[in-house]
Each structure stands twice: as C-alpha cells, then as structure tokens.
Swiss-Prot record:
Gene Ontology MF: a single term: exodeoxyribonuclease VII activity
Free-text function comment from the UniProt entry: Bidirectionally degrades single-stranded DNA into large acid-insoluble oligonucleotides, which are then degraded further into small acid-soluble oligonucleotides.
Reactions the enzyme catalyzes: Exonucleolytic cleavage in either 5'- to 3'- or 3'- to 5'-direction to yield nucleoside 5'-phosphates
Annotated source species: Chlamydia caviae (strain ATCC VR-813 / DSM 19441 / 03DC25 / GPIC) (Chlamydophila caviae)
Pfam families attached to this UniProt entry: Exonuc_VII_S
Record has Ribonucleoprotein as a keyword: no
Record's subunit section: Heterooligomer composed of large and small subunits.
Protein's recorded name: Exodeoxyribonuclease 7 small subunit
E.C. number(s) listed in UniProt: 3.1.11.6
Record's subcellular location: Cytoplasm
GO cellular component: cytosol; exodeoxyribonuclease VII complex
GO biological process: DNA catabolic process
C-alpha cells in the first residue's frame, strides 16, 4: 500500500469516514475500514514527514548559499 499516491490515500480516507458514518455499516465492516484507515494515515504521516524534511533541507541549503554570498561580498 506504500506506493499509493498521497492524494489518493487522502481521498480514500475521506471515503472511509463517509462509510463509517453510515448507519448501515456493520461493526465488522467498520473495524476493517478502521484498519485500512490506520494504514493510510501512517503512509500519509510518513510522506508529510519526508516532505517537511526535504523543505527543511532545501531551506538550510538556501540559507547557506545566502551566507556564503554575503561573506564573499564583504571580503
């Protein structure tokens, strides 16, 4: 399930919430849906952490470049 695109995982989570809110959804079905939702949430959280790490990395590189450029201009 790890290969599912982030947007698809989020859309499926929304579907699961809708299904679980339906009175006709049985307890067994709700449990299976909950398990699926848990797996999808873990995937989404992992992708978000990776994206945050990448943004942080890019920001640090940009800041290092700016500092380096400032130092070269002052010398």
């Amino acid at each position: 399930m790890e290969e599912i695109p982030f947007e698809n995982a989020m859309a499926r989570l929304e579907e699961i919430v809708d299904l679980m809110n339906q009175p006709s959804t049985s307890l067994d079905s709700s449990l299976k849906l909950y398990e699926e939702a848990d797996a999808l949430m873990r995937i989404c959280e992992s992708r978000i952490r990776k994206a945050e790490d990448r943004v942080r990395e890019l920001s640090e590189k940009r800041n290092e470049t700016l500092l380096s450029e400032e130092e070269s201009c002052t010398h």
